[in-house]
Amino acid sequence: MLLLILAVISIGGLVEVVPLFYINETVEKVDGVRPYTPLELRGRDIYIREGCYLCHSQMIRPFRDEWLRYGHYSLAAESQYDHPFQWGSKRTGPDLARVGGKYSNQWHVQHLTAPRSVVTQSIMPNYPWLLDTDLDTSDVADRMHALRMTGVPYSVTQQEYDANVKKFGKTVADQLDINQAADNLLKQARDQNFDGISSRVTEIEALVAYLQMLGTLVDFTKYDEGYFTTFR
């Protein structure tokens, strides 16, 4: 019995470990993918807190019907900075992997506060408190630090910042600087004003910022479709 237990554990360990040696062969090399900005990151945290992932997947499968409805199937590269990832196949509501830019900011605010006012058949709950609640920005740097420990390239040192400038460009690198996290969050909220309220930053603003970037980072016109099939 002991030998059987050891054999099962060994097999399970191999199943978990071996794919790690081939990870570079399964993640597509594409331009544009970056970590979340501080505002988007807080929006993602709210998305998870409110249980949005229980009804919405973020994984478009490589089937024709999914392409026609949602757009290009999801790439592994697009989720490389997600901890935890938001894949899945349960869809009480539609997949959101490419919802970014599909609707206006105002539509999202209205849909989140009163879903049936824009989609009459919707069964989604109302989330009016998101519009009334100020966004807590006090721990955004700590959240970025935690993700940095998992390998997400948020920067603390000048060397890390310079590496991000080289990889993502200065504009993105500035947003990934943990030392300026709170200031960067407030600046993006002020500049883009996702909720239409300029006097304060609300939770709904962070959530809309997150939703509006989903699926927008990769320019698929730059790649031949055959390239992506080599990673599947």
Predicted regions and their residues:
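Short pre-active-site segment immediately N-terminal to redox-active cysteine/selenocysteine motifs
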Residues: 50-54, 59, 92-95, 123
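Surface-exposed patches in mature extracellular/periplasmic domains of secreted proteins
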Residues: 55, 120-127, 218-226
